[in-house]
């Protein structure tokens, strides 16, 4: 099977990429090494949709997604991804914790994130179940949470509806170059898939 873009990995990144490419009329093939789409960390995580505590290099994309993608994602995918924007507390109970949290908050705020340091009492007003041991916290009211399984499967189903092809149980073991460009993908079972042009997206290249 040939496609303009071959995506190695059927996690949320691969499924989201397939959705957006197919939406724009690009032929897409997704190869997933396991038997199930989203079988790894994409569907087995806490579901945090957060800006706080991130590497500043990630923040422009994360901030864009929180402003323009997550609030409407359920409608886009025709799937309830259970997205809630209820804020994020990062807690501390020692002076060392406070120093770390202040650094994280300052770096994020410098990038435009709505995040600030608050006292333990302020944190307990937000979440009354917190221990009295909490003495400080960073608070980002625009952070939230979503269901990672529903989000991944929502992208998968909509990508298929738009014409993307998915094959599970096909572990990629080799990329073949033709005239200096990656043009073929070889799987453990011996199947060879060809890229129609020169596009190749590898969200899980380190795992293959």
Annotate each predicted stretch with a short phrase.
Residues 80-90, 104, 117, 124-162:
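Helix-loop-beta segment of a Rossmann-like dinucleotide-binding subdomain
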Residues 23-41:
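Glycine-rich FAD pyrophosphate-binding loop
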Residues 5-29:
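N-terminal Rossmann-like FAD-binding beta1-loop-alpha1 element of flavoenzymes
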Residues 96, 127-134, 176-183:
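A short, glycine/Asx- and small/polar-enriched loop/turn
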Residues 142-189, 193:
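Helical element adjacent to the flavin cofactor pocket in flavoenzyme catalytic cores
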Residues 198-204:
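Conserved small/polar residues in nucleotide/adenosyl-binding loops
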Residues 24, 111, 162:
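Conserved dinucleotide-binding and phosphotransfer motif residues
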Residues 46-126:
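Dinucleotide-binding Rossmann-like beta1-alpha1 core, especially the glycine-rich loop
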């Amino acid at each position: 099977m040939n496609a303009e873009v071959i995506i190695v990995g059927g996690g949320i990144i691969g499924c989201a990429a397939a959705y957006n490419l197919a939406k724009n009329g690009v032929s897409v093939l997704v190869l997933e090494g396991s038997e199930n789409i989203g079988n790894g960390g994409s569907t087995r995580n806490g579901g945090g949709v957060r800006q706080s505590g991130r590497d500043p290099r990630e923040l422009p994309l994360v901030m864009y997604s929180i402003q323009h993608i997550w609030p409407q994602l359920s409608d886009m995918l025709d799937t309830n991804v259970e997205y809630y924007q209820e804020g994020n507390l990062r807690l501390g109970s020692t002076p060392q914790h406070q120093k770390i949290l202040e650094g994280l908050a300052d770096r994020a705020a410098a990038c435009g994130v709505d995040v600030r340091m608050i006292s333990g009492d302020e944190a307990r007003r937000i979440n009354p179940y917190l221990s009295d041991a909490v003495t400080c916290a960073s608070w980002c009211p625009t952070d939230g949470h979503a269901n990672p399984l529903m989000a991944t499967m929502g992208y998968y189903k909509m990508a298929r509806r738009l014409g993307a092809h998915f094959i599970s149980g096909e572990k990629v073991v080799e990329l073949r170059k033709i005239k200096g460009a990656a043009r073929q993908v070889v799987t453990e079972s011996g199947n060879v898939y060809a890229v129609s042009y020169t596009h190749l997206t590898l969200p899980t290249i380190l795992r293959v």
